[in-house]
C-alpha cells in the first residue's frame, strides 16, 4: 500500500502516488468526455538507474455483466500465445501454443473461441495477444446481450502492444476465491505474460515485439487511453 493524493480541477480528477522502493512516481488524470473516460498516465523514474517496467492496465469484468456462454468479446488482436505452463487446475488450453486470435488450441478436444466466455462448469486460462501494429489504435470490446451494453477500452498500440486475457471460472478454491469467483481480465500493457520482472526481461521479445519497456533514470513516459460504455443491441 502507498499513500496517494487526489485533486480536482474543473472536470479533471488527478491521483498521484510515490513508490520509494520501486523508485517511481505515478500520476493518473481522468476526464469525462461525453460517454468516454479519457485517462492520461505519467510514470517518472526518480531513481539513479534505468528500470525495466511491465506497465499494465488490469481491467477485470465480473457478474452480472459477465455470463458464461453469453458475454462476447472483440479485440484488435493478431498473433497470440497460451501461457507457458498449465494455468490453474482447470486450464483447458494447450500450454505455450501459438495461434491467431481468436481461436486457441485446447488441451484435450476442440479449440476454444476466446470471443465468447467458456461454458465449462470450471475453467482457468491465460493467453497473450499482440495488438495489430498496423493500426493507429488498439481496442477490446465486451458485450452483454442481457443488458444491451457494450464496454471497452481504446489505446495506442505503440503505448501498450499487448493484451492479456485471464479467465477464472470457479477454479481457485483458496481464499478469497473459494471456488465461487467468475472473472475475466482484459489486461492491456507493455508486457504479455504475468511473470516476474526477471522472467520478463529474459523473455525480451515475443513475435518480434518487446516484452517490457525500459524507463531511463530521471525520465518520464506518458500514455493516454479511453474507457467507453454504450447501450447497443448488437
Regions found by a protein language model. Give the residues of each.
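Short Pro-Gly-centered flexible turn/kink motifs
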Residues: 41, 213-231
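Coil-to-beta-strand transition motifs
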Residues: 21-25, 32-39, 48-52, 148, ...
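Short, structured patches in soluble enzyme cores that scaffold and shape functional sites
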Residues: 17-19, 28-34, 41-45, 55-59, ...
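Extended, loop-rich substrate-binding clefts of extracytoplasmic carbohydrate-active enzymes
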Residues: 1-34, 64-66, 203-204
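Asparagine-centered strand-capping/turn motif at beta-strand->loop junctions
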Residues: 42-47, 144, 229
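A contiguous, surface-exposed recognition patch within enzymatic or periplasmic domains that forms
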Residues: 49-53, 64-215
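Hydrophobic residues positioned within well-ordered beta-strands of beta-sheet architectures
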Residues: 13-15, 26-28, 39, 55-57, ...
